[in-house]
């Protein structure tokens, strides 16, 4: 096994661990889920570049008669990238004492101020940073508001 194959296996394992944590473990942490809201995706150009570069590497490996295991590992990495960037839906998960946003736990007590912008972006001011929450469905903002009012 070459160093290239070892690095590919490590990247695949890391992406697989992230996908399992995001889909199965995170919703079960810190109590029952009160509300899970799908969010808008960020720009997909990075994901297109990532998957495109992997496809170029697969093509290069096949045309140069490279190791077959490397081709399979690159294909698995491309599939994991496709899942992470295009199939998985980013979401904000509200719990009793806080919420998960971008896979980070934030307690309600850390929220100093909340504003709603004209284009439907919920802005939460924390101690040292702002969270810009872009929901997929504008009606979900009312659900978030009702939940935050009832838990505070």
Curated annotation (Swiss-Prot):
Location in or out of the cell: Cell inner membrane
Domain of life: Bacteria
Regions that span the bilayer: 6-26, 45-65, 67-87
Name of a matching Pfam family: DUF986
Bilayer disposition of the protein: Multi-pass membrane protein
GO cellular component, one term: plasma membrane
Keywords: Cell inner membrane, Cell membrane, Membrane, Transmembrane, Transmembrane helix
Family from the record: Belongs to the UPF0266 family.
Protein name: UPF0266 membrane protein YobD
